[in-house]
Swiss-Prot record:
Pfam families: TPR_9 (PF13371), Transglut_core2 (PF13369). Keywords: Repeat, TPR repeat. TPR repeats lie at residues 193-226, 227-260. InterPro entries: SirB1_N, TPR-like_helical_dom_sf, TPR_rpt. It comes from the Bacteria. The lineage of its organism: Bacteria, Pseudomonadati, Pseudomonadota, Gammaproteobacteria, Lysobacterales. This is UPF0162 protein PD_0709. It comes from Xylella fastidiosa (strain Temecula1 / ATCC 700964).
Amino acid sequence: MVEQLLLPLWNNLATVDDETLPLMSTALLIARDEYPDLDANLYDTLVQSYVEYLRSEVEEISLWPLKMAAVNRYLFQKLGYSGNHDEYYDPRNSYLNQVFERRLGNPISLAVIQIEVARRLGIPLDGVSFPGHFLVRLPVDDGILVMDPFNGGRPLDAEELRERARPHLGGEAPDDRALAQILNPAPHRTILVRILRNLHSVYANTDRWDRAARCADRILKLVPNQPEALRDRGLAYLQLGHRSGALNDLKRYLQLYPSTHNVDMVRGHLVDLSNERIQTH
């Protein structure tokens, strides 16, 4: 009997430890919101077929970087997985089932596949929630090897990493200590929240507020009372005409984050919503 891949339940995720939160199956759970007929076992079987194809080659290699090079050659050259440079903000780039089907994705979705294949082969690959584009990292004897899944798993040296980080740090390149902190392994929860934030951004920027609200709500299933997700869901509810939901979320946001830079905007919405409630009573 073939073991079935069981997707987790949204309402249980907040209490799951970061170390045991399943990465690929929760990423597929995110995709199932948009593709309700998604067959998770199909993609689990697909990943396992990649693993079985690679197993003998990888087991004959002793060094982690060379093992990972074999994985990258297979995924990015033989199978043709690649970054979607032409339509970077296509939401399909964030839905893992679509990345498997089209072999096109964004940095974080490609990283999830890389990590899943590597881990099943015993390779300790981690994600890096790098500013701008998501990366992956592998321990080596003298430190870590950082790779770019959006560009075929290409290795990145310290100088290129500093230059990539610079625009996101006020124009300052990080020193060695700051760079090491940026390159810390990303917990699975952080990776999943970043997938959802990417999707929320795409949907909010294209006025698809029902989906934007859904993405913010899913973040709150992973991280209850996460301030930015409360704000984002509240603003999406406002656009959808769900006034009571907007009022509750935006109030809670200001309670948790009273010094936010957008306090005036949020307070303005709260005043308008409160006035509407008074007028309807």
